[in-house]
């Protein structure tokens, strides 16, 4: 066996790769519960890929057969109902762990120098994940899938001059049809997963090149022993591979409780209108995207005034796009001399708390029908959302920070 491994290693550096990225990759010894979510995101990604492959085997990507094939999977394919619930619950679980992963990065300054590329790759993963979720959302060909896709694609029509042609190009038809379903299926099953996997690899390579951040925001490479090993670091394997098993166990418990007992999650994961086949002639009472898009949808609806000759719909699209785009420049907006919220001042802590609260409430407002009062609240919270980023260069530079220790703490 050793001879075989040596033969392979001479031609493919398997052992070197293992040592660099796992066995001899030294991670800070003070990781806490917030550091579970990166590995959990990988776990959910594997779940989505495996269940997606099996669902594709029985799915019919046509306007005539899509809805019926989903019902066939649920009723006649052995364990088909489980595969679908694993996939639909996994989609929401993916966004849960990704949002928590992003929150941890904001909390501990994991985007600051020299980790800007890690953040950029992470944001690209988030963007591709949103596209992947949107494409997959149409595939059940239910009422909410159909009309939700119709609303989102029509948003591109708000762009001056090219909007209508762009919407037509995305749909491949004058309305959402089997042609749209086919191209969304191809993107969801083939193109976007390839891009997603590539970005995940780049994200991990960039992380392992500069090293992991930690709750103190301290670079452990600055304190090494006589062997060149960080004094505050421990090998990722076996310490964190075993450590992460606890997080995986807790996650699986919650995940499977949802899968087996609450797969629809009261209409948040699987909406009731989606149990009816798509009907282009009948609009649902209330059209709303899946919960993980609703904060941005609430921002879109919050814009109600035409400006400089352009309709409110256009400005709503700009606000929604800007809310995502501004995340990419966070590494250059934060001017704080420290990374972690543990040592930042009250201004940064208060700003982050208001930002998170605004995002959560916007998520709720995007789920429910718009009223005058809700629209006003959404407008205020949208302003808070953007102020968190736009004022960041000022409050992070002005505030008084705490002294950062030379070595990591517990």
What feature does the model see in each segment?
Residues 1-93, 97-410:
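Membrane-embedded and interfacial regions of multi-pass energy-transducing membrane proteins
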């Amino acid at each position: 066996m050793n001879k075989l491994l040596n033969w392979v290693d001479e031609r493919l550096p398997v052992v070197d790769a293992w040592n660099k990225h796992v066995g001899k990759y030294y991670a800070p010894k003070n990781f806490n519960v917030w550091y579970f979510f990166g590995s959990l995101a990988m776990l959910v990604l594997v779940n989505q890929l495996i269940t997606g492959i099996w669902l594709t085997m029985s799915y019919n990507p046509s306007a005539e057969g899509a809805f019926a094939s989903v019902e066939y999977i649920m009723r006649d394919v052995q364990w088909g109902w489980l595969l679908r619930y694993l996939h639909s619950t996994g989609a929401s679980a993916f966004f849960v762990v990704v949002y928590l992963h992003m929150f941890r990065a904001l909390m501990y300054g994991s985007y600051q120098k020299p980790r800007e590329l890690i953040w950029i790759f992470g944001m690209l993963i988030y963007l591709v994940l949103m596209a992947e979720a949107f494409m997959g959302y149409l595939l059940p060909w239910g009422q909410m899938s159909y009309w939700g896709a119709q609303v989102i694609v029509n948003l591109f029509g708000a762009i001056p001059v090219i909007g209508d042609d762009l919407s037509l190009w995305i749909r491949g038809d004058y309305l959402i049809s089997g042609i749209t379903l086919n191209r969304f299926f191809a993107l969801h099953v083939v193109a976007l997963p390839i891009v997603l996997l590539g970005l995940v690899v780049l994200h991990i390579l960039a992380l392992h090149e500069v090293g992991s951040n930690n709750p103190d925001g301290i670079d452990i490479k600055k304190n090494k022993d006589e062997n060149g090993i960080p004094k505050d670091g421990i090998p990722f394997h076996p310490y964190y591979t075993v450590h992460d098993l606890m997080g995986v166990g807790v996650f699986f418990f919650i995940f499977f409780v949802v899968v087996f007992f609450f797969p629809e999650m009261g209409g948040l994961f699987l909406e009731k209108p989606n149990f009816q086949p798509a009907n282009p002639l009948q609009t649902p009472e209330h059209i709303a995207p899946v919960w993980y898009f609703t904060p941005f949808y609430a921002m879109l609806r919050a814009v109600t005034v035409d400006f400089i000759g352009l309709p409110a719909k256009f400005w709503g699209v700009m606000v929604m796009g800007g809310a995502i785009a501004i995340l990419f420049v966070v590494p250059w907006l934060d001017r704080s001399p420290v990374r972690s919220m543990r040592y930042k001042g009250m201004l940064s802590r208060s700003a982050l708390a208001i930002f998170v609260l605004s995002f959560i409430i916007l998520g709720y407002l995007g789920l429910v029908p718009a009223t005058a009062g809700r629209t006003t609240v959404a407008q205020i919270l949208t302003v808070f959302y953007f102020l968190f980023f736009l004022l960041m260069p000022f409050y992070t530079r002005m505030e008084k920070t705490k002294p950062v220790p030379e070595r990591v703490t517990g």
